[in-house]
Amino acid sequence: MVEENHTMKNEFILTGFTDHPELKTLLFVVFFAIYLITVVGNISLVALIFTHCRLHTPMYIFLGNLALVDSCCACAITPKMLENFFSEGKRISLYECAVQFYFLCTVETADCFLLAAVAYDRYVAICNPLQYHIMMSKKLCIQMTTGAFIAGNLHSMIHVGLVFRLVFCGLNHINHFYCDTLPLYRLSCVDPFINELVLFIFSGSVQVFTIGSVLISYLYILLTIFRMKSKEGRAKAFSTCASHFSSVSLFYGSIFFLYIRPNLLEEGGNDIPAAILFTIVVPLLNPFIYSLRNKEVISVLRKILLKIKSQGSVNK
């Protein structure tokens, strides 16, 4: 009987959104549109950076990887969420949960380190422009990017491995729209203290290191900007950093609320708005934040549009 109960509770029901038929249809359309825009926007930015030699610099390599990470985040969460709007059971197995969280944790941890790498790149470009190619070499850029993804994989392996020490024998309703670790911990019949402690330590360490790197970089950047005598130089430096800082604020604000706050295991209705911001809104906005405020990207886009327009005129 114990074995039967244990097996039965290896399947869960996601109950994060409304069951109202009209609202379900509306939400499906909205989130499907967001999903398409997110994937197309981010993949387009990756393709733009990959295909134009002018953008093969450390900053754009980091931005390209951030765009790739954001598209992976959308692909890890949204398809199952859209399926559940019209699925009667809204069921997800423990193994599906583990896979979904593994990919989400990997890409979001990589995101943290990539954002810190972009901050360091901006620090070198603004505070030490003459030494930029020495301090921010292509080799270092590749090492930082590779390290971000390795750290993401290791971080997710730890948490996914610890999920399988838990036993689920009570309610199997997850009050969320995707399978995160905290909602699973709330359903565990085994005390999840170790899981919660490891989550707090490792997620906290990642946050402290990456946020610390971002803040220190921006502190030096601000000090350098205020010392600039040229108004044009100051405006250009502010413009360069504004888009990155906007993305950092949205991303870290939501992730801090989700994983670093006290009383993590309290019932998670309040998790959903922050999770929507973290997993859906931020990946949607990032390609527009990075491209629309970036003169290099806009310049390349204009050249592409002019080329397409001129080719169209010739064909006519």
Swiss-Prot record:
Pfam families per record: 7tm_4
Residue ranges of the TM segments: 26-46, 55-75, 100-120, 140-160, 197-217, 238-258, 272-292
Paired cysteines (S-S): 97-189
Coiled-coil spans in chain: none
Segments on the Cytoplasmic side according to the record's topology features: 47-54, 121-139, 218-237, 293-316
Glycan attachment points: 5
Highest taxon above the source species: Eukaryota
A GO molecular-function descriptor: odorant binding
Keywords: Cell membrane, Disulfide bond, G-protein coupled receptor, Glycoprotein, Membrane, Olfaction, Receptor, Sensory transduction, Transducer, Transmembrane, Transmembrane helix
Topology in the lipid bilayer: Multi-pass membrane protein
Disulfide bond among keywords: yes
Alphabetized InterPro entries for the sequence: GPCR_Rhodpsn, GPCR_Rhodpsn_7TM, Olfact_rcpt
Gene Ontology cellular component list: plasma membrane
Main location: membrane
Localization, UniProt: Cell membrane
Parts of the chain on the Extracellular side: 1-25, 76-99, 161-196, 259-271
Function of the protein: Odorant receptor.
Xref: PANTHER family: OLFACTORY RECEPTOR (PTHR48018)
Similarity comment: Belongs to the G-protein coupled receptor 1 family.
Record's protein name: Olfactory receptor 5K2
Record organism: Homo sapiens (Human)
Gene from which the chain derives: OR5K2
